[in-house]
Amino acid sequence: MVVKAIARNSIGRNGVGAFVFPCRKITLQFCNWGGSSEGMRKFLTSKRLDKWGQEFPWIQFEVMRKSGHPLLRAEYTNGREKVICVRNLNIDNVENKLKLLKDSDGDILRRRTKNDNVESLNSSVRGIWSPLHAAKRHRI
C-alpha cells in the first residue's frame, strides 16, 4: 500500500530565533477617473510608495487600476485578508491606513475579556522571560 503525502502550503510561524513578517502582500486599488480616488492617486504619483518598497522588500506591493472606490487589500501569512476602503482620504491618511495594514498580524479581532490583561504598577518578581535571551541550557 502506497502512502501519499497531503499537498498543503506551510503556514509561516514565529518561534525561537526566527521572525516571519505577517504581512505578505498589499494591493493598492484605485480608479483613474473617480474623485474619491484622488488621495490614492496622489500617493501613487509621489515617491512614497517607492520608499515603502525599499524599506520593506519582503512585502509585495501590487497596484491595480479598477473602477470603484479605492481600496487597500493586505494578505497575511496565516491565509487571512484585510480590506480597507480609503475613499475621499488625503495622501497622509492613505499612508496611515497602509501602515495600519502593515503592522497588523491578520488575526480576527476579538473582544478581550475581563481577565485577559493584567496591569500592575510593580515590575514582575521573576522578570520577563524571552526565549532569545535565555541561557543555552534552557533552550529546547
From Swiss-Prot:
Q: Which GO terms describe its molecular function?
A: structural constituent of ribosome
Q: Which SUPFAM superfamilies match?
A: Thioredoxin-like
Arranged from A to Z, the UniProt key words for this protein are:
Mitochondrion, Ribonucleoprotein, Ribosomal protein
CC terms in the record's Gene Ontology section: mitochondrial inner membrane; mitochondrial large ribosomal subunit; mitochondrion
Q: What happens when the gene is disrupted?
A: Has a respiratory growth defect. Shows complete loss of growth on nonfermentable carbon source and a gradual loss of mtDNA with replicative cell growth and an increasing number of generations.
Pfam families per the UniProt record, alphabetical: L51_S25_CI-B8
Any one Gene Ontology BP term: mitochondrial translation
Location within or outside the cell: Mitochondrion
Primary localization = mitochondrion
Further remarks about this protein from its record: Present with 3400 molecules/cell in log phase SD medium.
Q: Which family does it belong to?
A: Belongs to the mitochondrion-specific ribosomal protein mL43 family.
What is said about its interaction partners and assembly? Component of the mitochondrial large ribosomal subunit (mt-LSU). Mature yeast 74S mitochondrial ribosomes consist of a small (37S) and a large (54S) subunit. The 37S small subunit contains a 15S ribosomal RNA (15S mt-rRNA) and 34 different proteins. The 54S large subunit contains a 21S rRNA (21S mt-rRNA) and 46 different proteins.
User: So what does this one do?
Assistant: Component of the mitochondrial ribosome (mitoribosome), a dedicated translation machinery responsible for the synthesis of mitochondrial genome-encoded proteins, including at least some of the essential transmembrane subunits of the mitochondrial respiratory chain. The mitoribosomes are attached to the mitochondrial inner membrane and translation products are cotranslationally integrated into the membrane. Also has an extraribosomal function, being essential for mitochondrial genome integrity. May interact with MHR1 to take part in the mtDNA repair mechanism.
Q: Which protein is depicted?
A: Large ribosomal subunit protein mL43
